[in-house]
Swiss-Prot record:
DNA-dependent RNA polymerase catalyzes the transcription of DNA into RNA using the four ribonucleoside triphosphates as substrates. It is an enzyme of class 2 (transferase). This is DNA-directed RNA polymerase subunit beta. InterPro entries: DNA-dir_RNA_pol_bsu_ext_1_sf, DNA-dir_RNA_pol_su2, DNA-dir_RNAP_su2_dom, DNA-dir_RNAP_su2_hyb_sf, RNA_pol_bsu_bac, RNA_pol_bsu_CS, RNA_pol_Rpb2_2, RNA_pol_Rpb2_2_sf. In plastids the minimal PEP RNA polymerase catalytic core is composed of four subunits: alpha, beta, beta', and beta''. When a (nuclear-encoded) sigma factor is associated with the core the holoenzyme is formed, which can initiate transcription. Belongs to the RNA polymerase beta chain family. GO terms for cellular component: chloroplast; DNA-directed RNA polymerase complex; mitochondrion. It comes from Adiantum capillus-veneris (Maidenhair fern). It is found in: Plastid, Chloroplast.
Length: 1071
């Protein structure tokens, strides 16, 4: 397996480019600021900026729930023009959130990640579209750097229009004149003057000057009335802002693309659209309409660019500096007008910069909550590409072509891993070798085939260059075919797959996983799976929870170690040294080379370990030492494993003995049977940490108090509180127990009515105040062990009146009925029954099966890779061998995977004296014995070791029940949702289920009495508790009353009358 680049490099390189290039560019563009009288001038020296080290460590910032940031200082000068006095000092512009060692940002103690956005690159694109009448027309779309766009289109009479929207278009002649050209310049510089001369003749408006064109352009685009509009500076500024700046600013990348497309020679520093650009675009549009030239493929990656961390942060810094500029201008003018002494520090405040970044990280769609379910989910989240967001596509309007796989995605964007649902095709993932260059283009490395020297050189090809070369597919055996010059090789060339001679190959892929993402690259035998199931497998790997006893997979692909290393979940020794101290919190290394230089003291380095830290997804992040005392280490070696790593390799699940067979119908439709051994031996036991918080603030009646003395509650609920009113560490708490005792003062409305209250108020003017309890309790299903109690003071609280208490509770969850489990091939299921181990089927050597899967879930879903994995895992279990199988091994020979599996099974049976492992009559199957009867089953059954993961979709988080609870105010029906302690909605399918069992009276009570009858439901509850029969209500339920009220609102009066049977019969006869 070749060495892969760092998987999180897109984040690190983007932030480095922001700090060293983008930040300097924006600071240098900060303008000089003068007061209204131009007596005093403020200027900043942006090229001498300084960024200080963050004041806190990453772990301390997360612990104290503050932002991990660095302060930005810039030298500033204040020049008094009259006296020529210059004041210069360093001013603090604000704080910039700093990227940590994991490639994420700590914002208010929470890990967040900036997702890269892929959108259309600025420039010009030619296409053929149909108008509202279905007539095809050639168009050219100009896309600005800010995402604004307009179109040039040519109709059947060779007239060229500028279209701003579906309903608004103007003649190109008006736009050109508004940009400063006259008729003579247009005719002289155009390659098709006859078309423009015909347009001039048909022009109805009389336009002689740019002012007339600006007025006409404004009237056509933005005027809401038909009144006369005259040229003015306000109209010019509004048009400049709403049209030219938003739709005509190309930027450096857009200018480069425009020059290449239209063969122009305009400097890249000219970022705005020029009149000659419009003329050249119109000329090329005419050529396209005559059949000369090619149309653009807008979905090609050469027409896309990636907005990485650098671009997103630069945009926010630009916005913040604009706000700071306005604020400095106001402060300077006010100080000069009032003749106050001013200094540069007195004019600059860090609030605009801090507020802009806080708003960006808190509300921007591309600033997302980091998925920390396991190390793989973190890494995949950092490498995600989003087509939605500001300036991009939308979920509802994105076309199928924009979502589909494109041939230019090869080696750059994974064709498998994407979101499901409305985001399908819009949220994608980078291929493992892909990278982003400085211009935002996605590149992919290839090996260049040299004819003379025979050496292969690594070359990074952009999507635009990829079309001009013959690229061989992912075949590592190409190097062995050099002697056969006449060998036919399959290659990609100009959007097609061809077969050419060896000597005609220009580049080849690096390895078979070249075009897959990380998640898909971790699936062994992925070539034997359907793409939909491979997608589900890569998705569910990100949902696996770390187990308390992680285990390496027997069958892997070889990328497990690099994913674990680059995710940051393992601890690495920075230098060579010897382990001199180990405990659960830290590891100390004595530096060998430094010790030789310094004879007086032996320098050491300390590696602090993560101990039961909560992740964003409530999973447990924990590190365990992986070295022993006195062990010699080299720099870069692993000293501690993470919660989901073993020996430096990713370990998301367990190797479980499975059997593919039906079992009494309990594994019907993706249901799964498990052995009770998985529970008793903590095979699938995981740790989860829940955070509960309560605010302590000052009210109008006084400050809230944290205390244990709460008379309103029973002492049993307060048993875990210490003298300060906080729960003690290590306490085991149940649902309803008090975690923080808190009293909130309130005005005693009832005490003021008693004689004592009125007397005290009349004599002393004292208003009696009582307090209500507002304690923090353990919610339903939140029992566990208290592992941490924190007092947090929010950094944005200027008055220091707000305090927040965080309580962390550790839960140990065993696998149970209702939990979701899955393999790596999209084979998922829900635990339906836990079977005693003596009743489970067992192998011929007496080993009971741990899990029973349905065999019907394999052929219809076409994920045969799980069969290869479980059989090879069985051989590896007996041979005590771990396999790392590179996908697409069919390049060696046909049926290579099947031959490998059967060969290893045969060897395992022969070496361990278990011939039943490989039966020639039924290869891959063996006889199982029924644990209940002791008799063998009638047919051979596929058994093996499969790598099974426990997913975060657990029944403890989903199941909910209530006997009574809150009701809606209008309908008087139970609320919806677990968080509101809601009830079960008896819908259509639930009614069918109850009807199937014939419980008609129970169904009637659920739909009427127990649902929304205010009086009858309390009587029913009392009758059930006392064992008496439930009485039928004499009045109608509340929902019927609501229906009557709604009908009355519509003018329909519904009355209820009692009619005898005879009268009812007469009424029907009259009808």
């Amino acid at each position: 397996m070749p060495v892969l680049p760092e998987l999180a490099q897109i984040q690190f390189k983007g932030f480095s480019r922001f700090v060293h290039q983008k930040l300097l560019k924006e600071l240098e563009n900060f303008p000089k600021i003068e007061d209204t009288d131009k007596e005093v001038e403020f200027r900043s020296i942006g090229n001498q900026y300084q960024l200080t080290e963050p004041s806190l460590e990453e772990r301390d910032a997360a612990y104290q729930c503050i932002t991990y940031s660095a302060d930005l200082y810039v030298p500033a000068q204040l020049i008094c023009k009259e006296d020529q006095i210059v004041q210069e000092e360093d001013v603090r512009l604000g704080s910039i959130p700093w990227m940590n060692s994991g490639g994420t940002f700590i914002i208010n103690g929470i890990a967040r990640v900036l997702v890269s956005q892929i959108l259309r690159s600025p420039g010009i694109y030619y296409n053929r579209e149909s108008d509202q009448r279905g007539i095809l027309a050639y168009t050219s779309t100009v896309i600005s750097d800010q995402g604004g766009r307009f179109k040039l289109e040519i109709d059947g009479r060779n007239r060229i229009w500028v279209r701003i929207s579906k309903k608004k278009k103007i003649s190109i002649f008006i736009l050109l004149v508004a940009m400063g050209l006259c008729k003579r310049d247009i005719l002289q510089n155009s390659r098709y003057p006859r078309i423009f001369s015909n347009m001039f003749k048909r022009q109805k408006e009389s336009i002689e000057s740019p002012e007339d064109a600006i007025v006409e352009l404004y009237k056509h685009l933005y005027s809401a009335t038909d009144a006369d509009v005259f040229f003015s500076e306000s109209i010019f500024r509004e048009l400049q802002k709403r049209f030219f700046q938003h739709r005509c600013e190309l930027g450096r990348i857009g200018r480069r693309n425009l020059n290449i497309k239209l063969t122009l020679d305009v400097p890249e520093t000219e970022s705005f659209l020029l009149p000659q650009d419009i003329l050249a675009a119109a000329d090329h549009l005419v050529e396209i309409s005559y059949g000369e030239g090619k149309l653009d493929d807008i979905d090609h990656l050469k027409n896309r660019r990636v907005r990485s961390v650098a671009d997103l942060l630069q945009e926010q810094l630009k916005l913040a500096l604009n706000r700071l500029e306005n604020l400095i201008r106001q402060n300077l003018s006010r100080a000069v007008r009032r003749k106050r002494a001013i200094t540069p520090r007195g004019l600059v405040t860090p609030v605009p910069v801090i507020a802009a970044f806080k708003e960006f990280f808190g509300s921007h769609p591309l600033s997302q909550f980091l998925d920390q379910t396991n190390p793989l989910s973190e890494m995949v989240h950092k490498r995600r590409l989003s087509s939605v967001g500001p300036g991009g596509l939308t979920r509802r309007t994105a076309s199928f072509q924009a979502r589909d796989i494109h041939f230019s995605h090869y080696g750059r964007i994974c064709p498998i891993e994407t979101s499901e649902g409305m985001n399908a095709g819009l949220i994608s993932s980078l291929a493992i070798q892909a990278g982003v260059n400085t211009s935002g283009s996605l590149g992919s490395p290839y090996l260049e085939m040299s004819d003379s020297s025979g050496e292969e050189q690594l070359v990074n090809l952009s999507p635009a260059e990829d079309d001009y070369y013959r690229v061989a597919s992912e075949n590592l055996l190409l190097s062995e075919w050099r002697g056969s010059e006449k060998e036919i090789i399959p290659v990609r060339y100009q959007q097609e797959f061809l077969s050419v001679l060896w000597e005609q190959v220009d580049f080849r892929s690096i390895h078979p996983l070249h075009h897959f993402s990380i998640g898909a690259s971790l699936i062994p035998f992925i070539e034997h799976n359907d793409a939909n199931r491979a997608l589900m497998g890569s998705t569910m790997q990100r949902q696996a929870v770390p187990l308390i006893k992680p285990e390496r997979c027997i069958v892997g692909t070889g990328l497990e170690s690099q994913v674990a290393l680059d995710s940051g979940s393992v601890a690495i020794s920075e230098q060579d040294g010897k382990v001199c101290y180990i405990d659960g919190n830290r590891i100390e290394l004595s530096l060998i080379h430094e010790a030789k230089k310094n004879k007086l003291a032996q320098p050491t380095t300390i590696e602090e370990l993560k101990i039961f830290e909560r992740s964003n997804n409530n999973t447990c992040m924990h590190q365990k030492p992986a070295v022993s005392l006195g062990e010699l280490l080299r720099g870069g070696e692993i000293v501690a494993d993470g919660a989901a790593t073993v020996r430096g390799e990713l370990a998301l699940g367990k190797n479980i003995l499975v059997a593919y067979m039906p079992w009494e119908g309990y594994n019907f439709e993706d249901a799964v049977l498990i052995s009770e051994r998985l529970i008793y031996e903590d095979i699938f036991t995981s740790l989860h940490i829940e955070k509960h918080e309560v605010e302590i603030c000052a009210t109008n009646q006084g400050p809230e108090r944290v205390t244990k003395q709460i008379s309103q509650l029973d002492g049993y609920l307060l048993r875990h509180l210490d003298d300060d009113g906080l729960v003690e560490l290590g306490s085991w708490v149940e649902a309803g127990d008090v975690l923080v005792g808190k009293l909130t003062p309130q005005e005693g409305a009832s005490s003021s009515r008693v004689p004592e209250g009125r007397l005290l108020q009349a004599i002393f003017g004292i208003q009696l105040v009582n307090a209500r309890e507002s304690c923090l309790r353990v919610p339903i299903g939140g029992r566990g062990r208290v592992i941490d109690v924190r007092w947090v003071y929010p950094e944005d609280d200027a008055t220091n009146d707000l305090e927040v208490i965080h309580i962390y509770i550790l839960q140990r969850r065993k696998i149970q009925v209702g939990d979701k489990i899955a393999g790596r091939h999209g084979n998922k299921g829900i635990v339906s029954k836990i079977v005693p181990r003596q009743d489970m089927p067992y192998l011929q050597n007496g080993t009971p099966v741990d899990m029973i899967l349905s065999p019907l879930g394999v052929p219809s879903r076409m994920n045969v890779g799980q069969i290869f994995e479980c059989l090879l895992g069985l051989a590896g279990e007996f041979l005590e061998t771990h396999y790392r199988v590179v996908p697409f091994d069919e390049r060696y020979e046909r049926e290579a995977s099947r031959k490998l599996v059967f060969a290893e099974l045969h060897e395992a049976g022969a070496r361990t004296n278990n011939p039943w492992l490989f039966e020639p009559s039924h290869p891959g199957k063996s006889r199982l014995i029924d644990g209940r009867t002791g008799d063998p089953f009638g047919q051979s059954i596929t058994t093996g070791k499969a790598y099974i993961m426990k997913l975060i979709h657990q029944v403890d988080d989903k199941i909910h029940a209530r006997s009574s609870g809150p009701y809606a105010l209008v309908t008087q029906q139970p609320l919806k949702g677990k968080s509101r302690r809601g009830g079960q909605r008896i819908g259509e399918m639930e009614v069918w289920a109850l009807e199937g069992f014939g419980v008609s009276y129970t169904l009637q009570e659920m739909l009427t009495t127990k649902s929304d009858h205010i009086q009858a439901r309390y009587k029913a509850l009392s009758a059930i508790m006392t064992g008496k029969p439930v009485c039928k209500p004499k009045t109608v339920p509340e929902s019927f009353r609501l229906l009557v009220r709604e009908l009355r609102c519509m003018g329909l009066n519904l009355e209820r009358n009692f009619i005898s049977e005879e009268d009812l019969g007469r009424e029907f006869e009259n009808i």
